[in-house]
């Protein structure tokens, strides 16, 4: 007889929700986390689209450690000496059914893990899982952690993008470097009123701000800023291969240092104290690098299943992880009740994902990673073009005024009208 009905590896969003669903159904479930606490090994820019969480915990707003409701969307094209920003807000963004929030993964993940434990899940922290155990038929039947072997009817892997256990469990090729990015982030402590004033936010409301161009020194990637209640999260994500293949590429940590000094950013964090520094690998390939989601006795969810998309204007992953964790937990319960946790018995998980927004979204944007990877002009050409156009419009030096088209067309032609049309066509196809 197995030690547990289910073992969940990883106490992140997918793992804690999967463990919660299993425990709520009365199953014996063990959640194993290599960090000393839930969230210790997790990093995010900081934005949670809350629709998935609301399906698990309808009243989460009353108890979850949320930072601010995001009510401002800002997107910037940057050069070293300029910044062009679109700032959007609407009543729809404040609607509870469509709300998103900034979060800090440490406190948020601990709260979510506590919900699983309160439901009856057992959790152990500070324990890395070294490998999986298989029975004589090859079915996954547990984990090995140090000298201990712990068995279960089903194992759910939610241990992140660089999951060696996932590669062991379902045997797939490691994602190419072109489909993986690395992110670094710092959290700057400021008082609540100062953040409201500097970011032009009402109390309790916040901004999500994405930067393209000089934020990554012209290579594939971008910068981000999220307002927390009493801090600002600022970071950079850059493609690993783009950095490695670019001559004299700037290290990612230096990109962040330079972003902090940019004229558009420096005043916002002036006088702030750095209270956190973190790094994380980010899956950028979407469904193109997604491994098999099930095997005999095993399921994958969250980053270990590469459930993430970066559209340039929007980054999503946490809502996918929560939804996948919920479906993994629910389908594991059904498989346990049916007495069949083979690959065939776990097929319901894949079917549920196929019918959900998770795989529908990832399939919809299957061409986007390749488009963004080769969209060099977004990270170097267009920021310069926009800067020059804006300068031609707003800089007054006493010279006679010339028609706008005479100022703008030479700038556009330097970029190449056919190049612009090609990029628009590619964006329409990919997005």
Predicted feature residues:
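Conserved Rossmann-like nucleotide-cofactor binding loop
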Residues: 14, 37, 162
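Short beta-strand to alpha-helix junction loop
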Residues: 94-114, 244-248
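Predominantly flavin-linked oxidoreductase catalytic cores and closely associated redox partners
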Residues: 115-265
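FAD/FMN-dependent oxidoreductases across multiple families
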Residues: 215-223, 229, 248-324, 341-343, ...
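Active-site-proximal substrate-binding core of FAD-dependent oxidoreductases
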Residues: 308, 327-378
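C-terminal auxiliary extensions adjacent to catalytic cores
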Residues: 372-431
């Amino acid at each position: 007889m197995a030690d547990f009905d289910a073992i969940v590896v990883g106490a992140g969003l997918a793992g804690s929700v999967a463990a919660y669903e299993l425990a709520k159904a009365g199953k014996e479930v063990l959640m194993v986390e290599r960090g000393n606490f839930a969230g210790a090994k997790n990093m995010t820019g900081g934005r949670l689209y809350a629709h998935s969480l609301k399906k698990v915990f309808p009243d989460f707003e009353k108890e979850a450690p949320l930072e601010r409701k995001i009510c401002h969307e800002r997107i910037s094209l940057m050069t070293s000496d300029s910044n062009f920003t679109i700032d959007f807000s609407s009543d729809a963004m404040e609607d509870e059914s469509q709300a998103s929030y900034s979060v800090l993964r440490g406190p948020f993940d601990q709260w979510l893990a506590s919900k699983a434990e309160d439901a009856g899940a057992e959790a152990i922290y500070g324990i890395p899982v070294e490998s999986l155990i298989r029975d004589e038929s090859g079915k996954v039947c547990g984990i090995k952690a140090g000298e201990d072997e712990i068995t279960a009817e089903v194992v759910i892997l939610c241990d992140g993008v660089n999951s060696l256990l996932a590669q062991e469990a379902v045997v797939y090729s490691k994602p190419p470097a072109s489909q993986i990015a690395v992110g670094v982030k710092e959290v700057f402590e400021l008082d609540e009123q100062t953040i409201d004033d500097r970011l032009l936010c009402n109390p309790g409301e916040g901004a999500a701000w994405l930067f393209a161009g000089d934020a990554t020194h012209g290579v594939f990637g971008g910068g981000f800023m999220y307002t927390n209640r009493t801090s600002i999260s600022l970071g950079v994500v850059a493609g690993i291969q783009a950095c490695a293949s670019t001559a004299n590429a700037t290290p990612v940590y230096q990109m962040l240092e330079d972003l902090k000094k940019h004229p558009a950013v420096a005043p916002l964090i002036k006088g702030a104290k750095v209270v956190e520094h973190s790094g994380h690998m980010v899956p950028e390939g979407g469904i193109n690098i997604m491994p098999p989601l099930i095997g005999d006795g095993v399921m994958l969810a969250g980053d270990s299943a590469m459930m993430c998309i970066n559209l340039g204007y929007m980054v999503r992953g946490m809502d996918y992880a929560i939804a996948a964790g919920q479906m993994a937990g629910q389908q594991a319960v059904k498989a346990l009740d049916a007495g069949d946790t083979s690959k065939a018995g776990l097929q319901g998980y894949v079917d549920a994902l196929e019918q959900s927004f998770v795989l529908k979204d990832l399939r919809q944007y299957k061409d986007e990673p390749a488009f963004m990877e080769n969209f060099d002009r977004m990270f170097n050409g267009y920021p310069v073009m926009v800067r020059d156009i804006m300068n031609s419009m707003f800089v007054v030096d006493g010279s006679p005024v010339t028609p706008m088209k005479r100022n703008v067309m030479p700038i556009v032609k330097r970029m190449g009208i056919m190049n612009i049309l090609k990029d628009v066509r590619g964006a329409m196809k990919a997005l």
